């Protein structure tokens, strides 16, 4: 959120795993489609963010001027309902200042975050309490950009070796 590291693009949260929905916002090559399908079946909804090449109609401000976008399906019924009401796709950012710990509850949110948003919904304590794992599928070799709630070993069991 505040003081965001521009290396990471914004994340688009999706209502459900559908290749067509992902392809509305990102390019998915044939090879990446197979990997994405395996990852989605294993880890979505859940704490896995997949980086793909964004389509041109996604405004550059949403991706910090870059050409990639993060895609994720959250594992929270309330979030899924909000995404559904927003048309099935919702641009989001994290609820922490870049580099700081991920809050597990409303009470752990920093005052800097609370002062910058118009609405906060307290949905209880986060079951994971850890950031999502981020995997980049924009090149021939999948690459882990951030270790998170899903272990690299779990990902490698599904799609093989990652960088």
How does the language model describe each region?
Residues 1-163:
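Active-site-adjacent structural elements in enzyme catalytic cores
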